[in-house]
Amino acid sequence: MTHGTIHSVESCGTVDGPGIRFIVFTQGCPLRCQYCHNADTWEFGCGRSVSATAIIEEAEGYRSFFEATGGGITFSGGEPLAQPEFLEAALREAKQKGLHTVIDTAGSVVPKNIDQILDHTDLVLLDIKHIDDATCRILTGRSNANTLAFAKRLADRNIPVWIRHVLVPGLTMTETFLRQTGEFIRTLGNVERVEVLPYHQLGVYKWEALGLDYPLKDVLPPSAEDATAAQELLTSYLS
């Protein structure tokens, strides 16, 4: 029986894929995003150990909500692709049970069994941290090369994708970078939706609890007008 390590679950999520969803937050992430609101999911080797079978059985308790709303199960994190064997096993069992499956990922980790994982995935929420590699390294500690290559792989397999992009003043919120992101999205052909996520500071207390210095403490969230403009700009590249 395949086991994984999770941070927590959310029984009735409504923002990580279509419908009402059972969200599994896996434990462990190789990125160190400066705006991360779940810094407590970074560390590997801690969290709750659970079998793929057990987590799908737990999700099945909400089947009536899924069927009424077109929902299902979403694997988020942390970085779910950092636990590839567990993810593949859980997704396989979910599909065997007839559940709609979503992976919420930054695509920075591409495991050897990625094609087997995608065989059981209905939708990918792909977070493009930054289209510029140098800035991405500053923002996350990692290159964006794997993310962009993963996006192209998803396009080649014609797996539906929702692109996510966190709007951070001074880092991601420039027209040049937004247009470059849009031009990349336009090349893919399988992107159903773009979601601009306005930067916020709701996770600062987690950094403080972990004894970490929050690097963006002086950065204010974008205005509603700026967020709307960015959303409209990126969405225009889907047409």
Protein language model regions, located:
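Conserved AdoMet/S-adenosylmethionine-binding subsite of the radical SAM
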Residues: I56, E60-G72, S76-G77, L81-L202, ...
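N-terminal/domain-start segments enriched in small and hydrophobic, helix-friendly residues
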Residues: I6, P30, T41-E43, L154-V161, ...
